[in-house]
Swiss-Prot record:
Disruption phenotype: Cells lacking this gene lose the ability to utilize ethanol as the sole growth substrate. It comes from Mycolicibacterium smegmatis (strain ATCC 700084 / mc(2)155). Transmembrane segments: none annotated. Belongs to the peptide chaperone MftB family. InterPro entries: MftB. Peptide chaperone involved in the biosynthesis of the enzyme cofactor mycofactocin (MFT). Binds MftA and MftC with high affinity, and is essential for MftC activity on MftA, likely via the formation of a ternary complex. Is required for the in vivo ethanol assimilation in M.smegmatis. NCBIfam families: mycofact_MftB. It comes from the Bacteria. This is Peptide chaperone MftB.
Amino acid sequence: MSTQVAEQITFDPDVSWRLHHQVAVRPEPFGALLYHFGTRKLSFLKNRTVVEVVNSLADHPDARSALCAAGVADDQQAPYLHALGVLVQSNMLVPGNPEGSQ
């Protein structure tokens, strides 16, 4: 019997991130649905600011810059950073650098 151990990536808000290439974003009135075709996982984004940040991550050098561009003040970033960290743990987001791409 073979078991695969997925490499656990730790979210660092000071590095580049992007959507996994197998993730589709479907806009919804409440925010968006993310569907990972590789893992068949579904995530609900219930905040339009989070949707904006997730969609723009690849355009910014790091997650904090994406949050600032979306109008999230430094002292308001904690819940957004937590949400991005959860998306990293579920493999919806991956490092933006070529070495970490999947």
